[in-house]
Curated annotation (Swiss-Prot):
It comes from the Bacteria. The gene is murA2. It comes from Staphylococcus haemolyticus (strain JCSC1435). It catalyses: phosphoenolpyruvate + UDP-N-acetyl-alpha-D-glucosamine = UDP-N-acetyl-3-O-(1-carboxyvinyl)-alpha-D-glucosamine + phosphate. Pathway: Cell wall biogenesis; peptidoglycan biosynthesis. It is an enzyme of class 2 (transferase). GO terms for cellular component: cytoplasm. Belongs to the EPSP synthase family. MurA subfamily. This is UDP-N-acetylglucosamine 1-carboxyvinyltransferase 2.
């Protein structure tokens, strides 16, 4: 097993590049199953364990998958005779595996998918997915830990209203509806940039999806889709994490490929704190002064403040004066990292769905464990400014969403190593 060891106190300077988006590449890879002709080539693919997992799922479904990690490219040929079952062995590792259900229903008219796994942050129910599939004409039942879905006469377009703008449900329903008969209108959808990227990919394959990025998405079903080449958008969460790494060390860093339009709520909060963000065509220069102002943060569905930046923002707020409140409205049970911050002498408490930070914490190095993907990054950020040595374990979480995170920080001047123990 590996751990990351950080000696705090170094100011970060230099330039760092953002990878392709984890939360965009996974649905785009599953959408490749929709193409009954040709092969798809996906580029700007990040070298993450989740990408390997979803590739294994696609291979299990009998798609031909070639992954060139050096080039950051994946070739997917789904013109084969697809299998209907995504087994627990892979689906249990990652929730995004549920996203094969929409494409399988669309292509085959039936699918068997194990109930998903992934990060342990809240219930993350899949009722919205099931509700959407049923509205399109699928019959669903749960048995022995599997979801069984089938249609008698194929999927048919309809009007669907989501109870909550679930990202996964929005993606799954778009994919299912892309080959359905007629028009589907989905209201109260998720508006994340990753939804827009998926819609763009399906349209490049010959689909007809409009309205992605707004409250309502319309899909006109087509008879077939074909493989194409598509470049994955930059990862706005990695970009945000690297921006905070610069700010927390009061550094001077250029984050290449950070997209301003993808991070408006985070930018607003950082600028409110006094972080300087100079956006250019190809990225952003980040600088910060010693004294940052306190702000309150509330996570919300996009375009609100992203829940995936909550723990990193807590790390930064620990270094600012004053009273700060962070309220989590998207996932329950997403303050497990607070106990680890407290091991580092953080003055932070949790009350219900809010975390409260009193004053500026004099962070001290400690041995801490990552509780989920974003918490792993946040604890490393705290270690950058803690007095003494911080050791972060449970790096399997980190590897699900960040490529060579410690190497990137090291290139900017951090005293950080990844060691086997």
């Amino acid at each position: 097993m590996d751990k990351i060891v950080i000696k705090g106190g170094n100011r970060l300077t230099g330039e760092v590049k953002v990878e392709g988006a984890k939360n965009a590449v996974l649905p785009v890879l599953t959408a490749s199953l929709l193409a009954s002709e040709g092969q798809s080539k996906l580029v700007n693919v990040p070298d993450l364990s989740d990408v390997v997992t979803i590739n294994n799922v696609l291979s299990t479904l009998n798609a031909n998958v070639e992954y060139n990690k050096e080039e950051g490219a994946v070739l997917v040929d789904a013109s084969t005779t697809l299998k209907e079952e995504a087994p627990y062995e892979y689906v249990s590792k990652m929730r995004a595996s549920i996203l094969v259900m929409g494409p399988l229903l669309a292509r085959l008219g039936h699918a068997i998918v194990a109930l998903p796994g992934g990060c342990a942050i809240g219930a993350r129910p899949i009722e919205q997915h099931i509700k959407g599939f049923e509205a399109l004409g699928a019959e669903i039942h749960l048995e022995n830990g599997n979801i069984y879905a089938s249609t008698k006469d194929g999927l048919k377009g309809t009007d669907i209203h989501l109870d909550f703008p679930s990202v996964g449900a929005t993606q799954n329903i778009i994919m299912a509806a892309s080959l359905a008969k007629g028009k589907t209108v989905i209201e109260n959808v998720a508006k994340e940039p990753e939804i827009v990227d998926l819609a763009n990919y399906i349209n490049e394959m010959g689909g007809k999806v409009t309205g992605a990025g707004t409250d309502t998405i319309t899909i006109h079903g087509v008879e077939k889709l074909r493989g194409v080449e598509h470049s994955i958008i930059p990862d706005r969460i990695e970009a945000g994490t690297l921006i905070i790494a610069a700010a927390i060390t009061r550094g001077d860093v250029f984050v290449r490929d950070a997209v301003k339009e993808h991070m408006t709520s985070l930018i607003y909060k950082l600028e409110e704190m006094g972080v300087n963000l100079d956006f250019q065509e190809d990225g952003v220069r980040v600088t910060a002064e010693d004294e940052l102002k306190p702000v309150d943060v509330k996570t919300l569905p996009h375009p609100g403040f992203p829940t995936d930046m909550q723990s990193q923002m807590i790390a930064l707020l620990l270094t600012a004066e004053g009273h700060k409140v962070i309220t989590e409205t998207v996932f329950e049970n997403r303050f497990m990292h607070v106990a680890e911050f407290r091991r580092m002498n953080a003055n932070i408490t949790v009350e219900g769905r809010s975390a409260k930070i009193q004053g500026k914490s004099q962070l001290q190095g400690a041995q801490v464990k990552a509780t989920d993907l974003r918490a792993a990054a946040a604890l490393i950020l705290a270690g950058l400014v803690a007095e003494g040595t911080t050791q972060v374990t449970e790096l399997k979480h980190l590897d699900r969403g960040y490529v060579n995170f410690h190497e990137k920080l090291k290139s900017l001047g951090a005293n950080i190593e990844r060691v086997n123990y």
